[in-house]
């Protein structure tokens, strides 16, 4: 199946408009356990259960990674919003000749008082120990773009986590169906041995 990237950098399946979920493999529901167990590679219930358990563990690992990304984004979004509010305040004050009194964070629970003269330049931390100077308007545009991207990514992560939960459920149901099939088969074998 061919895939194309949409405007957010998210992959959509060609033709049906469905979004692929970050390369998460879709768990296929086992309708007919008898025919499924006759397929090559499914010789015993134990091997099938082992494969399904491996798939389940992979889904759990993916969930852990997505949850970490979600936590990080949920922390970044309020920071970006707060910085945007500060920039808007500085935009209003840049025409004034009065200095702006503020407190800034030096370390956890340690603030320092400062007097900031009117300015049209700000420095933004971009990450990886990189700070760049921007005009207030440029900084505001950059942060608004970053906020939009972070919000879209958070929505995408929510969808991927929902999709992943569906895969958990499907895999768990498949494991239960294969296990029950094996129990029935063994009971049937035991009853035929007892009759003989």
UniProtKB/Swiss-Prot annotation:
Keywords: Acetylation, Chaperone, Cytoplasm, Nucleus. GO terms for biological process: negative regulation of amyloid fibril formation; protein folding. The modification N-acetylalanine is found at residue 2. Heterohexamer of two PFD-alpha type and four PFD-beta type subunits. Binds to the C-terminal part of VHL. One of its GO terms (molecular function) is amyloid-beta binding. Binds specifically to cytosolic chaperonin (c-CPN) and transfers target proteins to it. Binds to nascent polypeptide chain and promotes folding in an environment in which there are many competing pathways for nonnative proteins. InterPro entries: PFD3 (IPR016655), Prefoldin (IPR009053), Prefoldin_subunit_alpha (IPR004127). The keyword Nucleus applies. One of its GO terms (cellular component) is cytosol. Belongs to the prefoldin subunit alpha family. The keyword Protein biosynthesis does not apply. The modification N6-acetyllysine is found at residue 58. This is Prefoldin subunit 3. Its main location: cytoplasm. It is found in: Cytoplasm; Nucleus.
């Amino acid at each position: 199946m061919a895939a194309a990237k949409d405007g957010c950098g998210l992959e959509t399946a060609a033709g049906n408009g469905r979004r692929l979920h970050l390369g998460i493999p879709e768990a296929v529901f086992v309708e007919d356990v008898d025919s499924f167990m006759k397929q090559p590679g499914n010789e015993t219930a134990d091997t099938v259960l082992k494969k399904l358990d491996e798939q389940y563990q992979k889904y759990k690992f993916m969930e852990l990674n997505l949850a970490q990304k979600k936590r990080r984004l949920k922390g970044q979004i309020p920071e970006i919003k707060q910085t945007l509010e500060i920039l808007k305040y500085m935009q209003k004050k840049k025409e004034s000749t009065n200095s702006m009194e503020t407190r800034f964070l030096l370390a956890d629970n340690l603030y320092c008082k400062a007097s900031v003269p009117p300015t049209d330049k700000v420095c933004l931390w971009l990450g990886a120990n990189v700070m760049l100077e921007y005009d207030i308007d440029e900084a505001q545009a950059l942060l608004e773009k970053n906020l939009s991207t972070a919000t879209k990514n958070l929505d995408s992560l929510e969808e991927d986590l929902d999709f992943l939960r569906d895969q958990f459920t499907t895999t768990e149901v498949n494991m239960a169906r294969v296990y029950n099939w094996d129990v029935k088969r063994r009971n049937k074998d035991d009853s035929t041995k007892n009759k003989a």
